[in-house]
């Protein structure tokens, strides 16, 4: 895990400061360093009073896997308690707790937001939001054994315990603001279109944007900035002279 903590000048009194927190999730084959190495997130947030938590879940799709690594439980239950001991001035308020992620992490951010109701705002950038149209027994992403290790045997994704529709129906209080973006040239674009429609049918608060773009870091950094501008924090986009 990596943590970005705001500059001391942003925290006037550590004893009574209720600092907002953003959980920022990596994609497949990434880790807790990915956002730090591939984007300018540290510079972008240098003048913002915000704690950023970057956990590492390997390629576990932020689930409690079939092979015993309980990544979902770790982030949903254990990590907030651990962070509160290390950073006692980190907020415990839902309205100041946020989550976002790219690709696999986009799925993770939506799953965690819908199931825990811990986050007031959740974002997905090029998220792997649905596998309804993919044959996990025969695909070009990973071997069937990989998917079985994550999700087990699945006959119908939309009714499985791991679909976002199931999470929304069973657990969500529908108060979380969901912010979803995907590039129109991204291989996950159609999955995003499908999932957004399903979530909207269930009455969730979804803001969906799409624009020309591929499955690449340039777009994810840009969309992170756009998402940050929607949050109730003191973030200001840095001045960029042409």
Where are these regions (language model features)?
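Non-catalytic cap/lid and distal C-terminal segments of serine-dependent acyl enzymes
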Residues: 1-242
